[in-house]
Amino acid sequence: MTEPTSRPDIKPRSRDVTDGLEKAAARGMLRAVGMGDEDFAKPQIGVGSSWNEITPCNLSLDRLAKAVKNGVHAAGGYPLEFGTISVSDGISMGHEGMHFSLVSREVIADSVETVMMAERLDGSVLLAGCDKSLPGMMMAAARLDLASVFLYAGSTMPGQVDGNDVTIIDAFEAVGACLAGKISRDEVDRIERAICPGEGACGGMYTANTMASIAEAIGMSLPGSAAPPAVDRRRDGFAHRSGEAVVNLLRQGITARQIMTRAAFENAITVAMALGGSTNAVLHLLAMAREADVDLTIDDFNRIGDKVPHLGDLKPFGKYVMNDVDKIGGIPVVMKALLDAGLMHGDALTVTGKTLAENLAELAPPELDDEVIRKLDRPIHKTGGLTILKGSLAPEGAVVKTAGFDDSVFTGTARVFDGERAAMDALEAGQIQPRDVVVIRYEGPKGGPGMREMLAITGAIKGAGLGKDVLLITDGRFSGGTTGLCVGHIAPEAVDGGPIAFVRDGDQITLDVANRLLEVEVVGPDAEAEWERRKVGWEPNPPKYTRGVLGKYAKIVQSAAHGAITG
């Protein structure tokens, strides 16, 4: 006779605060927040949210958290809501505030871990709406390795100007166009008033929507939950079912790392490549994999990207936004096509307790529409929308969003700036010319600190009509909404003595996308000796912050090639 299989403990940690004589004080505290005698036998579910009133990205999370809690109650659990921070990249762009964007990812992960560990919660539903809050939540889920479900707030609807869709990126580009005399200040004002018609994250395939798509592909979100807009009441249904799902995961004994496996990360990269997603996905997936104890490296992105075509005709480079993806069936449509082509791991487990293939079989999504998302035999590009570069200027790697490139090779003359502001001043003064390579350094994870996004300068370059004629390279990052010829995440960064620290005005820089190379060449005789002379007596710029969160961050953050992690 076989031994009966033991059932998973649905209260793997909350017994520490609910069971036994010694927990009288803890139970007393819990009674004060509404728990009764019968509730102490239920699993306690943390409902962690980055809701705030600062940015439209997160406005719907308060409503969705209520629906999650109803779902937890309906499934037999007890929800306990708590909050964490979120930084709006759109508001913090182009000034000192952007130093704090990437570090917010770590603060979010650390704060969720702190609450979940301290209060002995059994599982979590984690809700987020803005760029860094999505990976921050998923990093926390992987680190804790409890039953966990991620829920996205949803994206905003596009605004309208003269019958044309506009998003927040149009505002950044309008600034450059206005400075170049191409449009009036009144036209900028019209765009400004239209770009955010309501709640939700920025609508293109920028960082938030890329990471929401990744959350679905990696199996941490319910199938079909990434694409519906924030205002769509289907999101309340997904929220309710997410609350039910986490309790079901506890009953099955399924934890985050059983879902966030090597195969799941490869699925996530595949979907990001097919959509032409944000370069920030590279940083965030590397960081998430580290928390999940998955050996993912920057080179895996090229390996997978070689096999996956770029299919999404999506902003910032394409025509469409996430709402259009929703209209054609959402991310399951993309995953089904990729699965049928043998490009995804169908046996990867998901938060439904079923595999990715089982979920897609139940949903039976329609075929690709061949406009918003191209069919595989008619791709926009034959390989994925993100490429990792190496070479003399980036020995550890750099990232380029090839989804927007027409030509595979660009060679130009270096114009070197220590920080974004100096580059913006030069552009406004008309000092940036076609075939220049704008080099912005000391903006890396440690040297920035915080690896600021360069959307203000890239938007201004495009608005000035130089988007296809000027290459911008940096040890900082780019927004998911960045367009133009841009290479970021150059590693080693300048403050660590990477080659970018020794580039000078007049050097020739070549970007060769086809061969995945980023090279620097000193012009003139004795070029090699001149390069070595530049290193003599070199010292990095002094730290900009020595106290506070950025002072601590700069001391411990690792290379962008490893995800800019801090642990």
Curated annotation (Swiss-Prot):
It comes from the Bacteria. Belongs to the IlvD/Edd family. The active site is at residue 479. One of its GO terms (molecular function) is 2 iron, 2 sulfur cluster binding. This is Dihydroxy-acid dehydratase. The keyword Iron applies. Functions in the biosynthesis of branched-chain amino acids. Catalyzes the dehydration of (2R,3R)-2,3-dihydroxy-3-methylpentanoate (2,3-dihydroxy-3-methylvalerate) into 2-oxo-3-methylpentanoate (2-oxo-3-methylvalerate) and of (2R)-2,3-dihydroxy-3-methylbutanoate (2,3-dihydroxyisovalerate) into 2-oxo-3-methylbutanoate (2-oxoisovalerate), the penultimate precursor to L-isoleucine and L-valine, respectively. The modification N6-carboxylysine is found at residue 132. Its EC number is 4.2.1.9. InterPro entries: DHAD_IlvD/Edd, Dihydro-acid_dehy_C, DihydroxyA_deHydtase, DiOHA_6PGluconate_deHydtase_CS, ILV_EDD_C, ILV_EDD_N, IlvD/EDD_N. GO terms for biological process: isoleucine biosynthetic process; L-valine biosynthetic process. [2Fe-2S] cluster binds at residues 57, 130, 202. It comes from Nocardioides sp. (strain ATCC BAA-499 / JS614).
